[in-house]
Amino acid sequence: VNQTLLRSAPYFPVHDVERSVEFYDRVLGFRCEYSAGTPLQFAICSRDGLAIMLRRVSPTAVIVPNEKQGGTWEAFFWVNDVLGLHSEFTAAGAVIVYGPLIQESYQMKEFAVRDCDGHVLGFGQALTVAS
């Protein structure tokens, strides 16, 4: 038996799927690969083979990002150039929550951004001797 998991995607409740798709495209470089509904009710946006699912919910009071519950991120992405990605996102107008900083306890250089619905995404690179 050799079943293989192929992909995974966090599922974010959002107020306005069209606005969120535009944000993920313009600010974070995630392209919409699938959408459904008129007006948009659901979308999948991806970058480098990694996806995020966006689903319209109403009322917006049901959107409670992890940060508001005492957590940190809704999703975390390991990357190969955290400083380059931070520069890209900053130039595109991303709201930086923290970083880039070094997390000695788990050996990562990381930063986080907040999307237009308050969801926080972390991006990190494993530390090496050269980092």
Name each model feature, range by range.
Residues 20-25, 89, 115-118:
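Conserved active-site tyrosine of GNAT-family acetyltransferases
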Residues 1-11, 31-80, 84-114, 124-131:
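Vicinal oxygen chelate
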Residues 14-19:
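Short acidic-aromatic low-complexity motifs
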